[in-house]
Curated annotation (Swiss-Prot):
Keywords: cAMP, Hydrolase, Periplasm, Signal. The gene is cpdP. It is an enzyme of class 3 (hydrolase). The keyword Signal applies. Seems to allow the organism to grow on cAMP. The keyword Aminoacyl-tRNA synthetase does not apply. Pfam families: PDEase_II. GO terms for biological process: cAMP catabolic process; negative regulation of glucose mediated signaling pathway. Residues 1-22 form the signal peptide. GO terms for molecular function: 3',5'-cyclic-AMP phosphodiesterase activity; 3',5'-cyclic-GMP phosphodiesterase activity. It is found in: Periplasm. This is 3',5'-cyclic-nucleotide phosphodiesterase. Belongs to the cyclic nucleotide phosphodiesterase class-II family. It catalyses: a nucleoside 3',5'-cyclic phosphate + H2O = a nucleoside 5'-phosphate + H(+).
Length: 330
């Protein structure tokens, strides 16, 4: 009994602590939530250790995320040049963010991009062809919003250049030393994306957009993603993952609508572990995103999800729960 309690204690410590030691990738959480909490929707900045420029992984909250992150000291090492007319938030948006990687075009993943577009600088939007098509058809169309893209309806303001990524093909990321490969994910009958970024040393970081488990989605998309990541696990090159857990385990499969629970996440990660053997994911840093904000007068879903992940974490992974404004190194 005492040994079991100690095991739970050590697992809890691994969940609630994450050292800010030097790593291959630097991230800043501009938005951590899924669903209805406007101003704190899914968005992460990332850069390799060798780069000074960031790219953004989804863009649910952009300017508000930059404001909160600056207030929390996430950009304390960045100095605005004397020649710049901008605040630090403006300088970051216009000069240091060099592109957007959009996993899918649901509003909670693109709202910040759309709202900030009038004052943004020229940059690429990377995505699978279907995602970019949704952006130009549904948002940048002179009906919902002016067309800031280089394709689509009506006059094109040419601020954003749509870059259609070919699934499974590595492509360079402009104005960085990184490259990227993208793969489609299944999201309740729609398509989402996992982006795998690789730095100049061959280290990789995986960002998963919204996704359901293969078993529920009747898909093999997650298994395909794990098979691409498996060789990097074997080489010790997978430095971290950001992946969603939108709901607690109490949510029935029929109500997941293309999302994960703690149980389903660990089952999916077990597929990756099986590809390299027991213990191969020990100490892997896995950041949890997209926890849905709840209006119910009950325990915070984030607290419940933390507890439930602890209970089933027989993989030895280090679960991290970033808050808006947090800067983490992987």
């Amino acid at each position: 009994m005492f040994k079991n309690k100690l095991a739970v204690l050590f697992t809890c410590l691994s969940v609630f602590s994450f050292s800010a030691q030097s790593g291959s990738f630097d991230t800043v959480t501009l938005g951590s939530k899924g669903g209805i909490q406007d101003g704190n929707l899914t968005a992460f900045l990332i850069k390799s250790e060798a780069d000074s420029n960031f790219v953004m992984l989804d863009a649910g909250s952009v300017v508000n995320g930059l404001i909160v992150s600056e207030q929390k000291g996430a950009f304390k090492d960045i100095t605005v040049p004397d020649s710049s007319p901008y605040t630090k938030v403006g300088y970051l948006l216009k000069d240091r963010i060099k592109g957007y990687f959009i996993s899918h075009a649901h509003l909670d993943h693109v709202a910040g991009l759309i709202i900030s577009s009038p004052d943004d600088s020229k940059k690429p939007i990377y995505g699978l062809a279907a995602t970019n098509k949704d952006l130009m058809k549904n948002y940048f169309n002179w009906s919902a919003w002016p067309n800031f893209g280089n394709k689509g309806e009506g006059f094109k303001l040419n601020k954003y250049n749509y870059v259609d990524l070919q699934p499974g093909v590595w492509s360079p990321v402009a104005e960085t030393t990184m490259s990227v490969v993208s793969l489609p994910l299944s999201h309740s009958g729609g398509q989402s994306t996992v982006f795998i970024l690789k730095d100049s040393e061959g280290d990789v970081f995986a960002y998963f957009g919204d996704t359901g488990p293969d078993e529920v989605e009747k898909s093999s998309a997650m298994r395909t993603a794990w098979s691409v990541l498996a060789p990097f696990v074997k080489q010790g090159k997978l430095k971290g993952i950001i992946i969603e857990v939108s709901f607690t385990n109490e949510t029935p499969d029929k109500s997941l609508f293309g999302h994960l629970t703690p149980n389903w996440l660990v089952k999916e990660l077990s597929v990756l572990e099986d590809m390299n053997g027991k213990g191969s994911l020990k100490d892997l840093n896995v950041a949890i995103s997209h926890i849905k904000y709840s209006l119910k007068n009950s325990e915070d879903p984030k607290v419940i999800i933390k507890k439930q992940l602890v209970e089933v974490n027989d993989l030895g992974v280090n679960f991290i729960f970033p808050e808006q404004g947090d800067s983490l190194q992987f």
